[in-house]
């Protein structure tokens, strides 16, 4: 009985220690992924959202529902998230700044992110990066979109939509994570969020999602 009790106690201790290290590893992975996601949006993602907003015929309708406060709060973010989730993008490739888009998609950071194990394991992030590489190839193949036939423009519109929707979904997911664990960084990024109208501007423009 003593041996049995000791064995049971040892098993419980070992299991507890294993759980501790597993949770610690999960926390570390989440923190590392968060750092990479912050870097992505800082260097590429936010600007990409702004560029793709310019291609969205439905953006004017969306912008009328977005908050436009002088100082953004978490409540404004929740209103923004709600508006984005119910929005449907309507992409016009001919409205895109293709040169700026090509330059952004040529960033070496995309390759480094795709090689990062934590990004590879994140289905949404990994899929988004691969879709961005696909669009990069399409734009390289078609330097002048104005000469394309409608079926090819429709194909490009679909490619851009496949980027825009998960891109904004990842942005919302990331901002929710920051709001929970890094509120100071969350509020800092919220003040400069890619859906915020330019200073002195109105809420008109282009956007869409989920």
Give residue ranges: language-model regions:
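Membrane-proximal, non-transmembrane interface segments of integral membrane proteins
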Residues: 26-108
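A broad, structural surface signal
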Residues: 2, 35, 39-42, 46, ...
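Soluble C-terminal extramembrane regulatory/interaction domains of multi-pass membrane proteins
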Residues: 97-207
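Secondary-structure capping and boundary motifs in well-ordered enzyme cores
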Residues: 4-8, 33, 124, 128
